[in-house]
């Protein structure tokens, strides 16, 4: 099972960008990764 934390760690560049841009919360980025896995 892949946890949200593991996905967040793998997508840290994506999450960092989204958080800086302020358009999408990190949770949303994580959720997209889990749904596409």
UniProtKB/Swiss-Prot annotation:
Q: What is this protein called?
A: Non-specific lipid-transfer protein P4
Protein role: Plant non-specific lipid-transfer proteins transfer phospholipids as well as galactolipids across membranes. May play a role in wax or cutin deposition in the cell walls of expanding epidermal cells and certain secretory tissues.
Q: Which UniProt keywords apply?
A: Lipid-binding, Secreted, Transport
The family this protein is said to belong to: Belongs to the plant LTP family.
The record's annotation in SUPFAM superfamilies points to: Bifunctional inhibitor/lipid-transfer protein/seed storage 2S albumin (SSF47699)
Quick check: keyword Transport in the entry?
Answer: yes
Q: Which GO terms describe its cellular component?
A: extracellular region
Where is this gene product found? Secreted
Can you provide one Gene Ontology molecular function annotated for this UniProt record? Answer: lipid binding
């Amino acid at each position: 099972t892949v946890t949200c934390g593991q996905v967040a760690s793998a997508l840290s560049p994506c999450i960092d960008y989204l958080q800086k841009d302020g358009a999408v919360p990190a949770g949303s980025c994580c959720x997209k990764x889990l749904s596409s896995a």
